[in-house]
């Protein structure tokens, strides 16, 4: 355990170097400015979409979706818009919401978890939970969808410039992923468990919320 503490101390000292501290500070300031501007443009109800967008942009500089480049870009944008539509439909009725949430989360999770170790699903699930937790009226839906589309487009732009020169010959396209879908694979089972867990949590949250109204 002494060696573990020593390694931890060395790691802390390494991260306390002036250059690292300054770069981290600049990054934090940039994130705050981005989220603030996002909220100013699209409204406070959509500021968390900005949080998800900047999180995904930073993540996808290095992380890939295991999809062909063009399909990864399309999947990113459409997934964000799909989550906005699904969460609004889910608000009609808790049990309808459970079904809609389950299907949407499963589809999105499955498409981006071919390479499990990348955890590429995180910003998508985070976004779904955030927008589900900040309900809006139907009249506000167009603005939310625009916010989600812009967020997805910004992520796609970062993804394109970060991965356009990388070899994606071993990556799948969506049709191949659907054709080879197998309930015994880790990808399928993980997506199923993720969709079930998040959908149940959202159902319980909506029931508790209605009980306190």
Stretches with model-predicted labels:
Residues 1-212:
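Alpha-helical transmembrane segments and their membrane-interface boundaries
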């Amino acid at each position: 355990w002494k060696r573990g503490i020593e390694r931890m101390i060395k790691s802390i000292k390494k991260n306390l170097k002036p250059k690292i501290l300054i770069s981290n500070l600049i990054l934090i300031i940039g994130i705050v400015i981005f989220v603030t501007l996002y909220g100013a443009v699209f409204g406070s109800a959509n500021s968390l979409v900005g949080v998800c967008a900047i999180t995904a942009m930073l993540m996808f500089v290095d992380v890939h979706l295991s999809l062909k480049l063009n399909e990864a870009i399309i999947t990113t944008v459409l997934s964000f818009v799909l989550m906005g539509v699904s969460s609004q439909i889910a608000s009609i009725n808790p049990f309808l919401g459970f079904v809609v949430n389950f299907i949407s989360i499963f589809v999105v999770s499955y498409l981006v978890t071919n390479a499990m170790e990348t955890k590429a699903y995180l910003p998508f699930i985070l976004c779904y939970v955030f927008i589900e937790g900040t309900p809006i009226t139907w009249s506000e839906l167009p603005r939310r969808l625009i916010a989600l589309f812009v967020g997805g487009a910004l992520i796609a732009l970062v993804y394109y410039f970060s991965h356009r020169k990388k070899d994606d010959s071993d990556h799948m396209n969506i049709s191949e992923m659907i054709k080879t879908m197998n309930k015994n694979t880790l990808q399928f089972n993980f997506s199923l468990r993720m969709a079930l867990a998040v959908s149940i949590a959202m159902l319980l949250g909506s029931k508790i919320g209605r009980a306190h109204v």
